[in-house]
């Protein structure tokens, strides 16, 4: 007989299931049977089951027709289990290597349940461990740590009712209250004595799709004699970073969720002692849900169900709570619940209004920057839209550049006086042709977000912006995609784990999206899930590369920057790495290219123009490289820099798509390509066979390629021409004109 029976239901998302099995195979504890219960899967997983059947002691069961749900799968697992202990594992989650081993050691204390640590993540195991190493804690896990810090308890717990031992019951209450895995009544992350489960006939109610855990866990907690907390037994609960296309069960949007929650609470109450600790905690859970979540919907939601049917439904559920549950709530929350029990809708709304008002006051008190948002929502958004106002923004107002710059200048020159143009810019930038400049996230900025008719942005709009009827949003984006974007990414390792969810809402506000080539059109449709109008005219920022006076512009810029006339120029433009960041929109960067070696070998003929991505927060130290390295990372317009560059070196930045319009040499310094390709983004094209230049892995190879640049040009001549036809086919110097004529009619 195996020691542990791991019960693993599977319904869908094969790639998550594969990672779950891969991680389980790395467990240091091997004495377990794996019971896989199939819930009529929609994907073919026979290959996975065959592969891991040779690794695990695996038994596979399928739910009968007409039976479905994780509750039914787990009940089958319990019935078929032969191990001394039970462990529930969801197919999109994973455990760390020593988790099971550490739990088994704890079972030597002859307890009925070992309670492990339940951590949350949006990432696969490798990226989760990377974040743990860098002390980046999920916000849900941070909340639990704070709760446990405030209430330190003994590891051993004996659950008792008030009738038996009031003091012990009070201690048990704090234990349940501060261990989230228990407090939320999830079965995950715990190891159960199978004899204890079978003897008491604990089962999951199969009528509940979303909230069956409490129907198993609450009766179990009430019967539990002893349990032990093990801090180094970690279960990782994975939140899906694409809740639009691949929602986890907890992320599914279903009209029935609300009623099921109430039904599950009411059913579970019937299984519990009315005066017991578990019943107390269950009641407090539903009250907290009403006070913190549902009450706001009663006031704010546009769906009247929250003020009619749902209001009555939650009131019926709250009617069953014990009076002492309310003792720990503040006065306004107590009044809110009392109003609910009296079916006083206006009273509840008044309490919510007071609660939100106090919350806003403290938000403003702590951070006065929220004031402009309040002004946006409550004042500016009520003003009429001004039909002649256009708001421009590039790279979160960091500079005056990119496609919005060229669209603006075309409008300013060709429609003088017709439009009031406003630029969002920080750091005191000046804009030609008389545009008004406002600072991003200022009152003026909020005002123009509310009243402008047109918007021309090259990145996403602020999350707090809400497009009004009649407004027109032009998204130019900022490059042909090499790296996989948004919904084409399996793993999101950037600073915002809700990236896909946020992007999905933001892209719904775009009326136009600019495309530089047919490849971009197809890719944007996929990665942005964009169904709106495409402006297939090329990038306005590339217009300058076709202007008849481009050589004069280049000559003037070289003189302005102090670049010697007798030196050729090498543009080095690296991008950022998703997993190396300080915070939202601020990325770390360590310069891997040996500029000192380049100076030693190339300075007689070349100088280097260093231009890092606008997301990179680090300032690159070029001490000792004066006269050879010109750091142009703060120079606004990279399109102008292209004009003075004889060679471009990049990695995974999209700059080479634009630079190729000049048909000048491109080198790729891809020292970390395997990590970038396999762990981070992945690519849309094969860099080994499709990019217009060689992949180089060391600084020495880069130097050698530059010294032999004529040979490189000849070697990649045909590939470069194919690349140019494929990716530069829309650019002709007139993109700004075409876009202005179509949008600003």
Protein language model annotation of sequence segments:
Residues 22-31:
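Short, acidic, metal-binding catalytic loop of nucleotide-sugar glycosyltransferases
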Residues 64-81:
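Glycine-rich, basic loop-to-helix element that forms the pyrophosphate-binding segment
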Residues 86:
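Short aromatic/hydrophobic "clamp" motif used to bind/position activated sugar donors
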Residues 94-231, 235-256:
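Donor-binding/catalytic cores of nucleotide-activated saccharide
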Residues 299-383, 391, 409, 413:
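Membrane-interface aromatic/basic loop that binds lipid-linked glycans or pyrophosphate carriers
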Residues 373, 482-582, 719:
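A nucleotide-sugar donor-handling region in carbohydrate enzymes
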Residues 399-413, 527, 540-622, 696:
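Conserved catalytic-core segment of nucleotide-activated headgroup transferases in glycan assembly
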Residues 654-727:
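Catalytic binding pocket for nucleotide-activated donors in carbohydrate/polymer assembly enzymes
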């Amino acid at each position: 007989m195996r020691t542990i029976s791991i019960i693993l239901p599977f319904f869908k998302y094969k790639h998550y299931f594969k990672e779950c099995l891969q991680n389980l195979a790395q467990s240091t504890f091997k004495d377990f049977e794996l019971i896989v219960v199939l819930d009529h899967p929609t994907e073919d997983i026979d290959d996975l089951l065959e592969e891991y059947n040779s690794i695990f002691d695996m038994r596979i069961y399928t739910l009968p027709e007409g039976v479905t749900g994780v509750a039914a799968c787990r009940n089958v697992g319990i019935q078929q289990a032969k191990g001394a202990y039970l462990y529930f594992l969801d197919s999109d989650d994973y455990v760390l290597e020593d988790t099971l081993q550490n739990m088994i050691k704890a079972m030597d204390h002859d307890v009925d349940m070992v309670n492990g640590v339940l951590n949350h993540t949006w990432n696969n195991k490798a990226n989760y461990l990377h974040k743990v190493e860098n002390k980046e804690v999920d916000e849900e896990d941070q909340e639990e740590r704070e709760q446990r810090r405030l209430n330190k308890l003994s590891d051993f717990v004996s659950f008792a009712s008030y009738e038996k031992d009031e003091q012990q019951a009070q201690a048990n209450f704090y234990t349940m209250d501060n261990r989230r895995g228990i407090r939320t009544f999830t079965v995950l992350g715990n190891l159960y004595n199978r004899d204890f489960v079978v003897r008491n006939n604990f089962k999951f109610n199969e009528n509940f799709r979303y909230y069956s855990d409490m129907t198993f866990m609450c009766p179990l907690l009430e019967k539990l004699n002893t349990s032990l907390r093990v801090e180094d037994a970690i279960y990782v609960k994975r939140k899906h970073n694409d809740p639009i296309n691949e929602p986890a069960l907890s992320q599914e949007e279903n009209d029935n969720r609300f009623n099921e929650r109430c039904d599950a609470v009411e059913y579970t109450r019937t299984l519990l002692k009315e005066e017991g600790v578990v019943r107390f905690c269950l009641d407090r859970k539903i009250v907290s849900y009403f006070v913190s979540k549902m009450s706001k919907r009663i006031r704010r939601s546009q769906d009247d169900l929250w003020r009619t049917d749902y209001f009555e439904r939650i009131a019926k559920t709250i009617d069953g709570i014990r009076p002492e549950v309310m003792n720990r709530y503040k006065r306004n929350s107590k009044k809110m619940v009392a109003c609910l029990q009296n079916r006083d809708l206006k009273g509840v709304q008044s309490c919510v209004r007071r609660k939100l008002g106090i919350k806003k006051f403290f938000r403003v008190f702590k951070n006065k920057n929220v004031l402009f948002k309040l002004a946006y929502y409550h004042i500016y958004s009520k003003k009429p839209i001004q039909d002649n106002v256009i708001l421009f923004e590039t790279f979160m107002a960091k500079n005056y550049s990119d496609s919005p710059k060229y669209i603006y200048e075309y409008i300013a020159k060709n429609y003088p006086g017709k439009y009031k143009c406003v630029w969002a810019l920080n750091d005191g930038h000046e804009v030609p042709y008389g545009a008004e400049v406002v600072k991003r996230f200022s009152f003026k900025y909020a005002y123009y977000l509310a009243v402008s008719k047109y918007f021309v942005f090259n990145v996403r709009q602020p999350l707090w912006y809400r497009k009004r009827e009649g407004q027109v949003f032009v998204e130019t984006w900022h490059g042909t995609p090499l790296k996989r974007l948004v919904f084409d990414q399996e793993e999101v390792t950037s600073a915002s784990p809700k990236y896909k969810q946020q992007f999905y809402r933001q892209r719904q506000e775009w009326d136009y999206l600019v495309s530089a080539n047919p490849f971009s059109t197809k890719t944007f449709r996929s990665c942005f899930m964009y169904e709106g109008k495409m402006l297939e005219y090329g990038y306005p920022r590339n217009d300058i590369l076709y202007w008849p006076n481009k050589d004069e512009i280049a000559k003037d810029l070289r003189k302005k920057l102090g670049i010697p006339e007798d030196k050729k120029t090498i543009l080095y433009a690296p991008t950022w790495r998703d997993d190396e960041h300080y915070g939202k929109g601020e990325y770390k960067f360590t310069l891997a290219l040996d500029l000192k070696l380049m100076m030693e070998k190339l300075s007689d003929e070349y100088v280097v123009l260093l231009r890092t991505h606008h997301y990179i927060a680090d300032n690159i130290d070029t001490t000792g490289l004066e006269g050879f390295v010109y750091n142009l990372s703060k120079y606004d317009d990279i399109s102008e820099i292209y004009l003075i560059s004889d060679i471009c070196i990049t990695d995974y930045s999209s700059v080479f798509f634009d630079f190729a319009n000049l048909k000048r040499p491109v080198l790729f310094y891809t020292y970390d390509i395997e990590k970038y390709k396999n762990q981070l983004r992945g690519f849309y094209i094969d860099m080994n066979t499709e990019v217009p230049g060689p992949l180089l892995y060391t600084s020495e190879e880069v130097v050698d390629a530059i010294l032999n640049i004529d040979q490189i040009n000849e070697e990649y001549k045909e590939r470069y021409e194919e690349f140019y036809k494929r990716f530069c086919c829309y650019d002709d110097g007139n993109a700004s004109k075409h876009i202005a004529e179509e949008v600003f009619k």
